[in-house]
Amino acid sequence: MNYFITFFFMHIAVLNFYFRFSNGNKIVMRVGGSPETKRLERSKRQALRMDNEPRWPRGTINYFFDEQRFDENSRATVLRAMEKISNHTCIKFSPKDARIKLRIVSDKGCQAAIGRVGGDQQYLSFPTSCYSVGSASELIHVIGFLHSHQRADRDEYLKLNLQPWRLNDWFQTMQYKKYLDQWWIVPYDYGSIMQYHDSDNEYGPKNSKYFRTMGSQIPSYFDYLMINEYYQCSCEGEEQINCKNRGYPNPGNCSECNCPLESSEEWKNITLNLDAGYMSLQNGTKLHQIDFVFRYLSISAPANKTIEVDIREITGVECNYGCYIGGIEVKTHEDRRMTSPRLCCKNDNEIYKSRNNPTIVMAFNSEGLDKYNIFYRFTD
């Protein structure tokens, strides 16, 4: 039996692990406790390492906007990114004066040092070209993490075809192998906000279904988890908190859980209408919203059935790398914490098959009105 569903809307959204990469030397970055920690159950993880102690003291980053060099059109974007990180981790951003501060300017390019690098002030460059909640990636650099394509295990997931000029760019091409004997935190997630898109045909995914997923502007479940493990964030008495879907108590609010799925309600034969509208800058320019709006569909099937999802109509959705304006994701990955392939281009559509029961469909948008016509059925 086919069920027909129509989605009207606009978009936003969210996550981690543990493995040791050893290449023979002394530099060790212990992250978030022992290898037996409950949150870390698989074999591959994301690492970080740039200095002997790149963490910010007590997980607090005091900051200020340089009024002479900062573009006020970007203030709300930076503050929203700070809020999202603090809401899911124990990292706190404080405008209070302190001896060690993050100085935020709007110079050319989105630029950030990796972790706490020393001195009384540290720079974060955030011009309007970095506009959107994707600015969280720059703040995650500040917290202590590099890009996904700089992981030591990148060759297992990416097909590199670097341009000649890029080969001389040590920072873009270096791998963590340089730092040797590291502790890894999270598995490789194509949907991480730290993963570049492949617009220059340099970092192609070995799993081609993730081509549009790469370059996401949405912090993933594992993005937040790696921060929490690295800074050893936890909640007192967290064993008493019952988190579903392999979630864990949220250090940003210990009465809640950080879960890979935002919704568990069952929806059938329903129409969703949601308009994200536009953001107006001080000069009158209209842009997409800073953050995304989300809508979720939960599809439950009889026992031992496969759920097939066919997205037959897509209107109002912009086809681009990372689906950074909006798109839709059918959670087909067997590990529900991982990002599944995303869709924002009409020609990329396929029938998605899932053994997850329920299967969650996540739609996200940051500009205007989007529409999806969705069919689903159950098969043996």
Swiss-Prot record:
One of its GO terms (cellular component) is extracellular region. GO terms for biological process: molting cycle, collagen and cuticulin-based cuticle; proteolysis. Pfam families: Astacin. The active site is at residue 138. The keyword Protein transport does not apply. Residues 46-234 form the Peptidase M12A domain. Disulfide bonds join 90-233, 110-130. The keyword Glycoprotein applies. It comes from the Eukaryota. GO terms for molecular function: metalloendopeptidase activity; zinc ion binding. Keywords: Disulfide bond, Glycoprotein, Secreted, Signal. Glycans are attached at residues 87, 253, 269, 283, 304. It is found in: Secreted. Residues 1-24 form the signal peptide. May lack metalloprotease activity. This is Zinc metalloproteinase-like protein nas-21. It comes from Caenorhabditis elegans. The gene is nas-21.
